[in-house]
Amino acid sequence: MTHYSVTLKNANAKELADKIEKILIEEVPPQEKISFERKVGDADAFLYVYERRYPLRQKGIVTFNVLITDDKKETTVDVSVSGLQGVWKNKTGEQFIEFVKHGIRDYEIKL
């Protein structure tokens, strides 16, 4: 599993979620199965799940999870990729995370 977490200052969780969703939609080929699940809790949490299912000769599932939580003071983005690596448009989990980092580069990272 590949994991990345970053805490941001002055970020809007919904705007951030929309931006990451746009990255996923643009990077996932239209013929692939893509599903988004948005859950909003007390702390404005957004959870995105993407799964790619393989043909029978290549059994396996790759799942991308993006969890965005916002407690009004700071916003945290957690990204994890599990399953077989290197199969989502020939990209590894690390490369997918680079897409996410690219999408949030305009925000101020809390050190």
Predicted regions and their residues:
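Amphipathic, interaction-prone secondary-structure segments
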Residues: G41-K59
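A short, structured loop/turn motif at beta-sheet edges
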Residues: A13, K39-D42, I68-T75
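Beta-strand/loop substructures that line and gate deep hydrophobic ligand-binding cavities in soluble
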Residues: L56-K91
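A structural detector for beta-sheet-dominated domains
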Residues: K9, Y50-E51, T69, S80, ...
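Ordered hydrophobic segments in well-structured contexts
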Residues: S5, S35, F46-Y50, T63-L67
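Terminal, regulation- and interaction-focused segments at domain boundaries
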Residues: M1-E32, F36, I109
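A conserved amphipathic terminal alpha-helix motif
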Residues: L84-L111
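Hydrophobic beta-strand residues in large extracellular and virion-surface proteins
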Residues: V6, I20, I68, V77-V79, ...
